[in-house]
From Swiss-Prot:
InterPro entries: Kazal_dom, MFS_trans_sf, OATP. The lineage of its organism: Eukaryota, Metazoa, Chordata, Craniata, Vertebrata. This is Solute carrier organic anion transporter family member 2B1. Belongs to the organo anion transporter (TC 2.A.60) family. It comes from Mus musculus (Mouse). The keyword Transport applies. It is found in: Cell membrane; Basal cell membrane; Apical cell membrane. GO terms for molecular function: organic anion transmembrane transporter activity. Most likely contributes to the absorption and the disposition of a wide range of drugs in the intestine and the liver.
Length: 683
């Protein structure tokens, strides 16, 4: 904050400018216009782009979560923890940032935070560059081989040594794996720390220096542009996952994989590099914005205000004080306690937190938002993977569905909620009724989702129900002479019986041919003793017979998500109108902190753990459980949609209680008013 002499100088210069402005010539400000870095509109543009790119980089991991699992052998529980770990860094520092408010150079702090976010994105991509090339077939000992040897049925005496032992495992291998995972967790923590100052400092800066009538418009534009970030993240993920993971170090001659192959791993790391570059570009203007800029004057009333200020000395003094009033505002939580030290602030905060938590409306609305946010966090993290596994579609197509349908409908829902609150001037009771209606409709749209999906197809030796005909086991008699690796994964499909084998070896195949058709190569395995007919099977998993159901599923799911998002603005208004005026700033800060701690941190882990319980076949790496290769689709659908249904039901119950309490308070207030009126009439 400027000292007294600085304020006096600023006031003298401002009064001089006002005196000059009444002359026939143009004002001094018009004669010497300030640069674009002293224009709050340019700051709004820059901040919109920065928050857009920040959400791109934070949302990109969710778009490639299943790919990262396959590449580094992670369970869904661990990947969910990884996706939620950026909230750890965010929550650990949010109180300190809220305390400091405008006591620091906010634009520069935003710039430094953005550079940390970009650094975190680069760290997320680092494991790709320090790890060995991806091996999609364990039967080859040469990591850089163009065409990995097929895992064929070979007699034990002819099998290579690598096929009979897990010789690639060592303490060095496990240490390297832990290092890769540790780097990604550190990057996610840094991502959360870097994002701490960006939104609160940006909003407070806009509110301080924008005209009071323009501030809501600017913040609305900011959020409108920002909400496109997750959609762009899923779109970027859709594009990047079509490229092979080792596109920068492809073996000569290419690979024999397509994106439909379950072993396919896309270029997950490339999206982090692109997003990081965009964040760096968006952060560069912040180092040129001033700590404080002149208060924006309303465009249509500027000259009238200038003439009025010149007509009266008293008016000058009032205008001058109003001109500098925003400079005295403290952004964040320090606004209500500017004289407290940091230690005193930390001591006061728990008492204010408990006071607000004892407020029934605040508590119930926050709990409903926790339920909704838990649903959204689980959806954003694992819905692409769910679609990929449930309907046997590619990761790229799953991301495209979310980015093109689900995210836009959520944005429309948020906008509709805001428009309804503004246009209809909804009271707290009406806001709670709107929230209740949105939650109820969202819940109803979720019911059909339990019945739309694909059952697990027959997998030899893994699924128990193989139909009327007895199916082969993992080591049937037809493949007993073969030396098959139990941890190898190179699926083939017997299209005549619609049975999938984990490797050609388990199907008893001894030969392999590659056929060229329409510019594409197709791999076939021949002389398969476990396959009827000509004994030939194509490489790859069996195609799902109900993949077309993904469209009605995602439409219903997206409509439900859009209806749930209608509650965003009215529930926020319930908090603002339901707490004491002096607690509003703290209430909003506590709301976001509680949502992070109770929803955005645990929900991805909860959803990931639920998904892991539906796995029927795990890949093993050095004796430890790694990525899941096959799920029980019916169980996966029931548990994933069931979790979503549970959180939606919790939100509905909370909003029902809020509406009941507000109606009771309204009736009591009406009764008191009637009694007072009767007493006055009697007097």
């Amino acid at each position: 904050m400027p000292d007294r002499s600085t304020k006096t100088t600023m006031g003298t210069e401002d009064m001089h400018e006002r005196k000059v402005s009444v002359e026939p010539q143009d004002s001094h400000q018009d004669a010497q216009p300030r640069g674009m870095f002293h224009n709050i509109k340019f700051f709004v543009l820059c901040h919109s782009l920065l928050q857009l790119t920040q959400l791109m980089i934070s949302g990109y991991l969710k778009s490639s979560i299943s790919t990262v699992e396959k590449r580094f052998g992670l369970s869904s529980q661990i990947s969910g923890l990884l996706a939620a770990f950026n909230e750890v860094g965010n929550v650990s520092l949010i109180l300190f940032v809220s305390y400091f408010g405008s006591r620091v150079h906010r634009p520069r702090m935003i710039g430094y935070g953005a550079l940390l976010v970009a650094t975190a994105g680069l760290l997320m991509a680092l494991p790709h560059f320090i790890s060995e090339p991806y091996r999609y077939d364990h039967s080859s000992s040469d990591n850089r081989s163009l065409d990995f040897e097929a895992s064929l049925c070979l007699p034990t005496t002819m099998a290579p040594a690598s096929a009979l032992s897990n010789g690639s495992c060592s303490s060095h291998t496990e240490t390297k794996h832990l290092t890769m995972v540790g780097i990604m967790f550190a990057a996610q923590t840094l991502l959360g720390i870097g994002g701490v100052p960006i939104q609160p400092f940006g909003i407070s800066y806009i509110d301080d220096f924008a005209h009071h009538s323009n501030s809501p418009l600017y913040i609305g534009i900011l959020f409108g542009i920002t909400t496109m970030g997750p959609g762009l993240a899923y779109g970027l993920g859709s594009l990047m996952l079509r490229l092979y993971v080792d596109i920068d170090r492809m073996p000569e001659g290419g690979i024999n994989l397509t994106p439909k192959d379950p072993r396919w791993v896309g270029a997950w790391w490339l999206g982090f590099l692109i997003s990081s570059g965009l964040v760096v570009l968006a952060s560069s203007p912040y180092f040129f914005f001033p700590r404080e800029m002149p208060k924006e004057k309303h465009e249509f009333h500027f000259r009238r205000k200038v003439l009025a200020s010149a007509a009266s000395t008293a008016s000058k003094g009032e205008d001058l004080s109003s001109q500098h009033e925003p400079l005295k505002k403290q952004a964040g939580l320090a606004q209500i306690a500017p004289d407290l030290t940091l230690v005193q602030f930390v001591k006061v905060f728990p008492r204010v937190l408990l006071r607000n938590l004892r407020h029934p409306i605040f508590l119930l609305v926050v709990l409903s938002q926790v339920c909704t946010s838990s649903m959204v966090a689980g959806m954003a993290t694992f819905l692409p993977k769910f679609l990929e596994r449930q309907f046997s579609i590619t990761a790229s197509f799953a991301n495209m569905l979310l980015g093109c349908l689900t995210i836009p409908l959520v944005i429309v829902g948020i906008m509709m909620g805001g428009v309804l609150v503004k246009r209809l001037h909804l009271s707290p009771v009406q806001c709670s009724a709107l929230c209740l209606l949105g939650s109820l409709l969202c819940l109803l749209f979720s019911v059909p989702l339990f019945f739309i999906g694909c059952s697990t197809h027959q997998i030899a030796g893994i699924t128990q129900d193989l139909g009327a005909q007895p199916g082969p086991s993992l080591f049937p008699g037809c493949s007993e002479p073969c030396s098959c690796q139990s941890d190898d994964f190179n699926p083939v499909c017997d299209t005549s019986a619609y049975v999938e084998y984990t490797t050609p070896c388990h199907a008893g195949c001894t030969g392999r041919v590659v056929q060229e058709a329409l510019g594409k190569s197709q791999v076939f395995y021949t002389n398969c003793s476990c396959v009827a007919g000509n004994g030939t099977v194509p490489a790859g998993s069996c195609e799902s017979a109900c993949s077309r159901l993904v469209l009605p599923f995602i439409v219903l799911f997206s409509l439900g998500a859009g209806l749930a998002s209608i509650t965003h603005t009215p529930s926020f208004m319930l908090i603002l109108r339901g707490v004491k005026k002096e607690d509003k700033t703290l209430a909003v800060g506590m709301q976001f902190m509680l949502l992070r701690v109770l929803a955005w941190m645990p929900s991805p882990v909860i959803h990931g753990s639920a998904i892991d319980t539906t796995c029927v076949h795990w890949a093993l790496t050095c004796g430890r459980r790694a990525v899941c290769r096959y799920y029980d689709h019916d169980l996966l659908r029931n548990r994933f949609i069931g979790l979503q249904f549970f959180f939606k039901s919790g939100s509905l119950v909370c909003f029902t209680l809020v509406l009941a309490i507000l109606r009771q308070q309204s009736r009591e207030a009406s009764t008191r008013t009637t009694v007072k009126s009767s007493e006055l009439q009697q007097l």
